[in-house]
């Protein structure tokens, strides 16, 4: 271990593993360490089921009705991949897809007035949806056509909207859309967690709705993908990429000290040895004095013996409860997967409800989601602090990732990865640099 590296990475969460893979592909000499004996850090999948019970101090362990413990892989952080999103691009460009198998998530639903409805995102679905009345449907259809045709480089498609200055609130007004439609457009299509976006320039929202529609168009049932055997497969896939390009991995390796000289990182001390480096990447747990708390997320893992009601017996789905529907500032999310994804015993389902904490009674905040899941066989409640770095790391060359937020997709994580890359390399992250061969997620060559 007494060696000189370009980059040392501490923690094997998804953000760290992707950056480690990218740096190795770029020819950097990388040492990657984790104090845990398993991959994934905060974003790991726990197996066997007995481990999950232990982790949550449920000492009696799982009952026999839960089946074989090793048939379970339970994600600690529930997220899906947008089929056309940034993480899928990273997987394709690096060919990490060869280590993973994906399934399309069967449905995307939105909550309104105590019931759940399928999210309409095409013209045909919008016209058939019970979410809106007839006239509302026509207006919404017009809006979707406008978004689909919108091209920020072609003013002819603007229809009087300025992408840089017109607010999204004004765009909704232009199409005369009602509050319910605005709710599900902003939260179930554009996937915002709060309503802060309404007064921002509309371009980002339009692009987010496009991403949703393009992701949906790709594979049909929903815009989301999920890997067989759980999300813990993702960091491991990028770790393999790093190893192929000469990266060194050490699990179960305690970190005693991060060594600084004149305010710059020069190495990491572990078990009496020092590995030297020019740059350091880590998650917040390795540098508590260089991060600040930015909020909390509650995640409740629920094991069920039945599909969720009114989802057409889907074996996987996402439900978004827009904040307006339950008098909150932040949305509540449910991600559900099952035995069909090799993450649970036969006939069992895992639904994870999560939201940004707003009160002193977080469990009560998630109640509207839990009501949709009844009866629940077993609950595991986790309340996590969210951390972010206090500086950009350019001076110290210590680059810290942000905690995983309450969103149910990886777009914010990818933004963090691109941001850290830019600060480390001094140039913007370019997917083209990582290109090995262009196939789609299911291994078929692109047309």
Swiss-Prot record:
It is found in: Cytoplasm; Golgi apparatus, trans-Golgi network. GO terms for cellular component: Golgi apparatus. Keywords: Cytoplasm, Golgi apparatus, GTPase activation. The keyword Ribosomal protein does not apply. SUPFAM superfamilies: FAD/NAD(P)-binding domain. InterPro entries: FAD/NAD-bd_sf, GDP_dissociation_inhibitor, RabGDI. One of its GO terms (molecular function) is Rab GDP-dissociation inhibitor activity. GO terms for biological process: negative regulation of axonogenesis; negative regulation of protein targeting to membrane; protein transport; Rab protein signal transduction; vesicle-mediated transport. Regulates the GDP/GTP exchange reaction of most Rab proteins by inhibiting the dissociation of GDP from them, and the subsequent binding of GTP to them. Promotes the dissociation of GDP-bound Rab proteins from the membrane and inhibits their activation. Promotes the dissociation of RAB1A, RAB3A, RAB5A and RAB10 from membranes. Interacts with RHOH. Interacts with the non-phosphorylated forms of RAB1A, RAB3A, RAB5A, RAB5B, RAB5C, RAB8A, RAB8B, RAB10, RAB12, RAB35, and RAB43. Belongs to the Rab GDI family. PANTHER family: RAB GDP DISSOCIATION INHIBITOR ALPHA, RAB GDP-DISSOCIATION INHIBITOR. This is Rab GDP dissociation inhibitor alpha. It comes from Pongo pygmaeus (Bornean orangutan). The lineage of its organism: Eukaryota, Metazoa, Chordata, Craniata, Vertebrata.
């Amino acid at each position: 271990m007494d060696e000189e590296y370009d980059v040392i990475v501490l923690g094997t969460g998804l953000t760290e593993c992707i950056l480690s893979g990218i740096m190795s592909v770029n020819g950097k000499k990388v040492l990657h360490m984790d104090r845990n004996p398993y991959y994934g850090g905060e974003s790991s999948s726990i197996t066997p089921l007995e481990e999950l019970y232990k982790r949550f101090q449920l000492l009696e362990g799982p009952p026999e009705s839960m089946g074989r413990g090793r048939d379970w892989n339970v994600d600690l952080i529930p997220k899906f991949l947008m089929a056309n999103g940034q993480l899928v691009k990273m997987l394709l460009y690096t060919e990490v897809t060869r280590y993973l198998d994906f399934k399309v998530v069967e449905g995307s639903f939105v909550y309104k007035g105590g019931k759940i409805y399928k999210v309409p995102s095409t013209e045909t679905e919008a016209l058939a949806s019970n979410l809106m009345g007839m006239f509302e449907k026509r207006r919404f259809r017009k809006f979707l056509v406008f978004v689909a045709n919108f091209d920020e480089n072609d003013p002819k498609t603007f229809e009087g909207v300025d992408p840089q200055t017109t607010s999204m609130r004004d765009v909704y007004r232009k199409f005369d859309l009602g509050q319910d439609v605005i709710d599900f457009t902003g939260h179930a299509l554009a996937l915002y967690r709060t309503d802060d976006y309404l007064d921002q320039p509309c371009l980002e929202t339009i692009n987010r709705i496009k991403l949703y529609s393009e992701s949906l168009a790709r594979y049909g049932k929903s815009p989301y993908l999920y890997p067989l055997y759980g999300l813990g497969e993702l960091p491991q896939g990028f770790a393999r990429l790093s190893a192929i390009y000469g990266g060194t991995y050490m699990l179960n390796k305690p970190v005693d000290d991060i060594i600084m000289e004149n305010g710059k990182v020069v190495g990491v001390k572990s078990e009496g040895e020092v590995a030297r480096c020019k740059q350091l990447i880590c998650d917040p747990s390795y540098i508590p004095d260089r991060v600040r708390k930015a909020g909390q997320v509650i995640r409740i893992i629920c094991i069920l013996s039945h599909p969720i009601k009114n989802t057409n017996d889907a074996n996987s789905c996402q439900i978004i409860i827009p904040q307006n529907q339950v008098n909150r500032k932040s949305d509540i999310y449910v991600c559900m997967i099952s035995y069909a994804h090799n993450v649970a015993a036969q006939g069992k389902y895992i639904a994870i409800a999560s939201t940004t904490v707003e009160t002193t009674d977080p469990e009560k905040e998630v109640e509207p989601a839990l009501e949709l899941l009844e009866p629940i066989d077993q609950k595991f409640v986790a309340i996590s602090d969210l951390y972010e770095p206090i500086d950009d790391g350019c001076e110290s060359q210590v680059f810290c990732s942000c905690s995983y937020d309450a969103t149910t997709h990886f777009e914010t994580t990818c933004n963090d990865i691109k941001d850290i890359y830019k600060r480390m390399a001094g140039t913007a992250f370019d997917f083209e640099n990582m290109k090995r061969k262009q196939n789609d997620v299911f291994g078929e060559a692109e047309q």
